């Protein structure tokens, strides 16, 4: 059996609920699993695989700097795409770090049944040579997208996909979140 979960967050960083440090993750209970990070972020010797809000495009600024963590790596599509397209044009959220070659990003992350996760093959202009002043980039993927996407849809790294292949069931299997 396989449990396949795609976890995203809409919880913005703010001073009222989480003191500018929103990071969400989940982990399972009551089945045998690998504790080396494939089954959750806080079980065993695991690196932090939590995500932040894909809806957040701004942060409170103080003296020219963001308060708390930087703006999440979120962007919006500038032009609509068709199924099979291998390139997208985006505008990164201001004050966020641009995506990088080799990263996997999700196009249309807010669309219930129309998301595309793809690896970045190239980015123009190259953010390693300086960030684009207008925050706009053209991204080429390693393969075409399955779905069409409308201009304005969100492109983000802020997701985690969990796939749990359960070896042993030890009772009521469940998972819960941490924020």
Regions found by a protein language model. Name each.
Residues 72-104, 108-158:
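Small/polar beta-strand repeat architecture
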Residues 1-72, 110, 114, 118-121, ...:
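Histidine- and aromatic-enriched segments that form or immediately flank copper-ligand environments
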């Amino acid at each position: 059996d396989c449990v396949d979960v795609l976890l995203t967050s809409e919880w913005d960083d703010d001073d009222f609920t989480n003191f500018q440090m929103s990071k969400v993750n989940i982990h399972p209970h009551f089945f045998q699993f690998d504790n080396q990070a494939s089954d959750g972020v806080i079980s065993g010797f695991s690196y932090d695989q939590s995500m932040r809000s894909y809806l957040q495009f701004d942060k409170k600024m103080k003296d020219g700097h963001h308060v708390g963590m930087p703006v999440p790596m979120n962007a919006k599509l500038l032009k609509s795409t068709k199924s099979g397209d291998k390139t997208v044009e985006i505008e990164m959220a201001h004050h966020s770090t641009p995506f990088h070659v080799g990263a996997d990003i999700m196009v249309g992350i807010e669309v219930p049944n129309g998301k595309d996760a793809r690896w970045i093959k190239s980015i123009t202009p190259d953010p390693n040579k300086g960030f684009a002043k207008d925050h706009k980039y053209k991204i080429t993927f390693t393969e075409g997208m399955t779905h069409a996407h409308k201009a304005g849809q969100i492109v983000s790294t802020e997701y985690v996909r969990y796939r749990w292949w359960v070896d042993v069931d030890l009772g009521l299997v469940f998972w819960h979140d941490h924020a």
